[in-house]
Amino acid sequence: MKSLYYVTQTLLHSRSSNLIKIISLTLGVTVSILIFARQAFELNYDTCYEDYERLYIIKNIYSLNEKITESHNTYGPVAAAIADAFPEEVESVTVTQQWFANTGWYKDDSRFACNAMTGDSCFFSTLGIRLLAGNPNELTNPDVIFISRDMVREVFADQNPIGQTLKMNRELPMTVKGVFEDFPENSSLYGTQIVISLASSFKHDWGYWGWDGGDGYTSFVRLRHAEDAERIIVRSPE
């Protein structure tokens, strides 16, 4: 019992020191958990898409002043050319423009700053993003937009957004034709709330489409099987 008494007294007299040690240990464990969680988050970046092992982004590698440069900017027709060249390996392709950052959109007199991008009818199926409402073929028509679930809550509250009109920069009316699931935080497209039909880009001359210039597009390819990737590596002539 004396031993227990002395141990008890020691703990009582040094309780402040023990408390600091416990707090320090707790903080250390918490920080470790946060670090591990962040590492896991980064290692799982862009794995949020359905069957992400089959999803690829097209990279452009070119030589400029004897320096090799890599870019995800491609010419508009590149994705379709790959699909035509490898019909047995490619399930679908999509082409986007991603430079509509922090664009002003208006519902009546209310302004909403949103990140937007263009997309074609294969946008959602190629990326593996769930479509909550609407027909993706609507993206073949100009002046059409699909909006995220989060934007529906922000702009329309309890109203049905389908058929409603939003104005881009207060000037260009766009009709809401669909709703898609929010891009998660570990996605390169996180924060994108509006997908504008690529047909709108053609109508309003937002970018050149051709093989002799206009590399402001980002292209994605979804393969039928992940192991087909090595067969579709496209190399530019040296």
PLM region spans:
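Structural preference for long, well-ordered alpha-helical segments in enzyme cores
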Residues: V7, T26, R38, V78, ...
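Short acidic/polar micro-motifs at solvent-exposed secondary-structure junctions
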Residues: N60-S71, T94-C122, L132-I145, N169-E171, ...
